[in-house]
C-alpha cells in the first residue's frame, strides 16, 4: 500500500494495473476523535494543529503541542504488511488536562466508485462489524440503516464491494457508539458510511489508544490473516450455504486457481466438478422421475376410478401400487434438497470473489 490517501495496488494475473485504485480521498473521508478537557467539552482532534514528522520511511508522527513542552497529543501511523496501518493516539503528560470519559473515534466516508456501475457496487457494499463474542453482522446493503454498538466490538469495516476500509482493535472497542450506512449512487460515490466508536480510557502520564486500519482487497487469505474473522466480510450466504461455499467450493476453486488457468475456464471446471459430486444424487432423482412417468397411466386410471369416490380408498390403492412396483414418490425430492446448498453456494461464491473482478473470458469483459 502506498503512503498516499488510500491507494491500493491490486495485482492481477490477466490484466495490467494502469493506476492505483482509490477507496477514498480527502474530500470523501473524515476521521477525528472527540476529546473532552477537564475544563471544556467537545474538542475535536481535526480542529487541532498537528506538526508532522517522518521518523522512518514507513512511519508518520503528528504532534499537537501545548505551551508546556512536556504535554502534547500525538498520532502515530506505521505501514505494515497485508494493507494494514498501525495507529495509536497518545496523550503525554495530559492526566491533569484530558478527561478520558466519553471519548469517541468518528469516521465518516463516502465510498468512491471502484466498479463500472454504481448500482452494482452499492448492492455489495455496507458497514460490516463484529461484536467481540459474536459472529459478524452488517447493515442493510439496499437501504439506509443504522445500529447501536451495544457490546465490545472487534472491528468495523466499510465494505466497498470488492474492497474494504476497516478499523480494528485487538482488545475490542468498548460498547457504545453506533454505525450508519446508506446508498447514495450519485456522482462519483456509491454509498455513505458513518461510525462512532467508544475509545474512552483512563488518562495517566502517558496513555496510548492503539488500533489498526486496513485498506485493501476483500481477499480471503488477506482478511483471514488478521485472525479475527474479518474474512466474513466476504458474504457467502448464511448457514449451510455459507458452510458449503467455504469448505467445499472455495478449496476446489483455490486448487484450480493454483494452476494459473483463465478465470473463465476455472468457473467451467468448478461447475463440472460440482456436477460430478452431485451426480449420484442427480441420477437418483432422474431414476425416480422415470419410474413415476412409467406409473403415470396407472395412477391416472386410479384417479379416474375414484374420481367421485372415496379419497381414502384412492390413496390406499395408490400406495399399494407404489409398494408393488417399489417406487417411493418422495425419493426424487430428497436428492433435490441435498443438492440445493451446493448449487446455491456456487451461485453465491463467484459474485463475491475478488478474483472475478476485471477478468475477461470469451465475450465477457468482466466476470464479476
What are the roles of these predicted feature ranges?
Residues 1-232:
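Soluble non-transmembrane domains of integral membrane proteins
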Residues 88-90, 101, 111-121, 155, ...:
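Helix-loop-helix
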Amino acid at each position: 500500500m502506498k503512503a498516499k490517501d488510500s491507494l491500493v495496488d491490486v495485482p492481477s494475473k490477466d490484466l495490467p494495473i494502469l493506476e492505483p485504485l482509490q477507496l477514498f480521498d480527502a474530500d470523501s473521508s473524515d476521521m477525528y476523535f472527540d476529546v473532552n478537557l477537564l475544563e471544556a467539552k467537545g474538542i475535536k482532534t481535526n480542529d487541532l494543529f498537528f506538526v508532522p514528522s517522518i521518523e522512518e520511511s514507513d512511519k508518520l508522527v503528528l504532534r499537537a503541542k501545548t505551551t508546556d513542552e512536556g504535554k502534547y497529543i500525538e498520532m502515530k501511523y506505521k505501514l505494515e504488511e497485508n494493507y494494514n496501518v498501525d495507529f495509536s493516539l497518545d496523550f503525554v503528560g495530559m492526566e491533569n488536562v484530558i478527561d478520558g470519559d466519553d471519548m469517541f473515534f468518528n469516521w465518516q466516508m463516502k465510498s468512491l466508485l471502484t466498479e463500472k456501475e454504481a448500482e452494482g457496487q452499492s448492492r455489495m457494499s455496507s458497514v460490516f462489524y463484529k461484536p467481540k463474542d459474536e459472529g459478524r453482522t452488517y447493515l442493510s446493503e439496499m437501504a439506509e440503516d443504522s445500529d447501536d454498538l451495544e457490546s465490545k466490538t472487534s472491528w468495523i469495516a466499510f465494505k466497498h464491494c470488492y474492497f474494504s476500509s476497516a478499523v480494528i482493535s485487538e482488545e475490542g472497542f468498548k460498547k457504545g457508539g453506533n454505525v450508519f450506512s446508506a446508498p447514495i449512487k450519485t456522482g462519483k460515490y456509491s454509498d455513505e458510511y458513518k461510525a462512532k466508536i467508544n475509545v474512552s480510557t483512563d488518562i495517566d502520564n502517558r496513555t496510548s489508544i492503539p488500533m489498526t486500519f486496513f485498506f485493501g482487497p476483500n481477499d480471503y487469505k488477506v482478511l483471514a490473516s488478521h485472525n479475527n474473522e474479518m474474512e466474513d466480510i466476504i458474504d457467502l450466504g448464511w448457514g449451510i450455504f455459507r458452510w458449503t461455499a467455504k469448505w467445499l467450493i472455495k478449496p476446489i476453486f483455490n486448487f484450480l486457481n493454483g494452476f494459473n488457468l483463465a478465470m473463465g475456464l476455472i468457473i467451467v471446471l468448478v461447475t463440472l466438478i460440482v456436477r460430478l459430486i452431485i451426480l449420484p444424487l442427480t441420477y437418483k432423482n432422474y431414476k425416480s422421475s422415470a419410474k413415476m412417468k412409467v406409473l403415470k397411466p396407472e395412477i391416472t386410471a386410479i384417479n379416474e376410478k375414484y374420481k367421485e369416490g372415496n379419497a381414502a380408498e384412492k390413496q390406499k390403492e395408490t400406495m399399494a401400487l407404489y409398494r408393488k412396483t417399489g417406487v417411493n414418490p418422495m425419493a426424487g425430492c430428497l436428492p433435490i434438497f441435498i443438492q440445493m446448498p451446493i448449487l446455491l453456494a456456487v451461485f453465491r461464491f463467484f459474485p463475491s470473489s475478488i478474483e472475478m473482478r476485471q477478468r475477461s473470458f470469451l465475450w465477457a469483459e468482466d466476470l464479476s
